[in-house]
Amino acid sequence: MAELVSVAILGYLLGSIPVGFLMGKLRGIDVRRYGSGATGGTNVLRTLGPWAALFTVLCDIGKGLLAAYLGERLAGEWGFVAAGLLASLGHSYPVWLRFRGGKSVATSGGVMLLHYPLAVLVGIAAGALAVVPTRWVSLGSLTASLAVVLQLFLLDAPLSHRLLVVALAVVIYVRHWENMKRIAAGTENRLGVKARPRA
C-alpha cells in the first residue's frame, strides 16, 4: 500500500510540471490569460505558436510515459495505474498553479503509450480524421480518447488497464466539458484561430 501511495504522489508531481505555463513565462506571457486558459498544447499553439506547442506536447507525453514506467517499475501493475492516473490529474490540476492546468490529452496518451503504442497511434489517427473536416482540436481529442478506450476493450486488456483507460477518458471528458457545449452549439474555436486575452 505504501508503494502505491508513493508512486501515486510521484505520478502527480511529474504530471503537475506545467510545461506550457513555463514556456509562456520564458516569453513573458501567462498562457492562462489567453484563449481557453489551459496550459496544454492547443492553447500554447494559439498563444505562442507551433514550436512552443510541439515542445509542450512532447514534454506532456513524456511526463505521462515516465510516470507510468516508474509506477510499474516500483509498484507493479497497480503502480502503473496509480501513477498514470495521478499524472493525468496532476497535469489538469497542478497544485503549483492553483489547480488550473491543461486537459490531460497528451499526458494520458503518454501513460498509455507504455503498453499500447499502436492503440495510441490509432487514436491519434482517429482524432486527426475528426479534426480535418471540422478544425475542432477538442473534437479530435475526445475522439482519440474514445478510440483508445474501445481498443483496449476489444483487445481484452487486463482489467486494471481497462479501468485506467476509462478513468483517463473521464478526466479528459470532464476537462473538455465547456468545449463539448461549444461543439454542440457550433461555436467552438477552430484550428488556426489565435487566442484572445481572457476577460
From Swiss-Prot:
The chain crosses the membrane at residues 4-24, 51-71, 77-97, 111-131, 152-172. Its EC number is 2.3.1.275. This is Glycerol-3-phosphate acyltransferase. The lineage of its organism: Bacteria, Bacillati, Bacillota, Clostridia, Eubacteriales. It comes from Symbiobacterium thermophilum (strain DSM 24528 / JCM 14929 / IAM 14863 / T). It is found in: Cell membrane. Pathway: Lipid metabolism; phospholipid metabolism. Probably interacts with PlsX. Pfam families: G3P_acyltransf. GO terms for cellular component: plasma membrane. The gene is plsY. Keywords: Cell membrane, Lipid biosynthesis, Lipid metabolism, Membrane, Phospholipid biosynthesis, Phospholipid metabolism, Transferase, Transmembrane, Transmembrane helix.
